[in-house]
C-alpha cells in the first residue's frame, strides 16, 4: 500500500513535512540490485505521473521534493507536493507513482471535505490520540477500508510482530515460549 494523499492539521504540518522529506530524499532510485525505489511498470506510466505532477504545478501546486522529470526510462525520484488543488488529476486520481501530496487543514470539517473531494479512496488511515475522534471522522469519509493509528503508544498491546519496543523485544518475550 502506498499513500498518495496526506491531509494534515496545520500545527504538525512542518514537523511532518520535514520528517517525510528527510526520509524520501535519501532513497536510492534505480537498479533493483542497489536501489530502494525501482522503476514504474512502464515508461508510459512514468510519463503519465510526470504529466500529472506538471499539471498540478501549473495549477499552483508547489513541488517540495522532486524535479518533475524522469530519472530514467521508467524511473521517477520521489516527489512531495503541497497546495494541490482538488480539481487536478493528481488529487482526483491515483498516480501510482512515487508522489505524495500533502494538504494542510485547520479543521476536521475541512479535512473531511478534502478527503471526499476525490472519488478514489480504497484505503484511508487516521493518526490521532483520540480513538473516538477517529471513529467520528471515519463515519464521514468515504473509503473502502479504514485503519486507525492511535498515537503515541500509550497502551500495553503489541503492534504487529515487532511490538512497542522492536523485534528484539518480541523475540525474547517470555510469553512467546
State the predicted function of each range.
Residues 1-8:
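Active-site PLP-lysine loop of aminotransferase-like
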Residues 4, 35-37, 54, 132-135, ...:
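Juxtamembrane/interface motifs at transmembrane-helix termini
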Residues 7, 62-65, 125, 147:
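Structured core elements
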Residues 10-120:
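NAD(P)-dependent aldehyde/semialdehyde dehydrogenase
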Residues 75-177:
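Conserved C-terminal structural/oligomerization subdomain of aldehyde/semialdehyde dehydrogenase
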Amino acid at each position: 500500500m502506498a499513500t498518495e494523499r496526506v491531509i494534515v492539521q496545520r500545527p504538525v504540518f512542518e514537523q511532518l513535512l520535514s520528517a517525510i522529506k528527510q526520509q524520501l530524499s535519501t532513497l536510492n532510485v534505480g537498479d533493483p540490485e542497489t536501489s530502494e525505489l525501482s522503476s514504474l511498470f512502464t515508461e508510459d506510466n512514468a510519463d503519465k505521473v510526470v504529466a500529472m505532477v506538471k499539471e498540478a504545478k501549473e495549477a499552483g501546486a508547489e513541488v517540495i521534493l522532486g524535479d518533475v522529470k524522469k530519472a530514467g526510462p521508467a524511473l521517477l525520484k520521489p516527489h512531495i507536493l503541497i497546495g494541490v488543488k482538488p480539481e487536478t488529476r493528481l488529487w482526483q486520481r491515483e498516480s501510482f507513482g512515487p508522489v505524495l501530496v500533502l494538504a494542510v487543514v485547520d479543521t476536521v470539517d475541512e479535512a473531511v471535505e478534502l478527503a471526499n473531494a476525490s472519488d478514489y479512496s480504497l484505503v484511508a488511515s487516521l493518526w490521532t490520540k483520540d480513538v473516538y475522534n477517529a471513529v467520528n471522522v471515519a463515519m464521514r469519509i468515504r473509503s473502502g477500508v479504514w485503519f486507525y493509528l492511535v498515537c503515541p503508544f500509550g497502551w500495553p498491546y503489541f503492534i504487529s510482530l515487532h511490538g512497542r519496543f522492536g523485534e528484539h523485544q518480541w523475540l525474547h518475550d517470555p510469553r512467546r515460549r
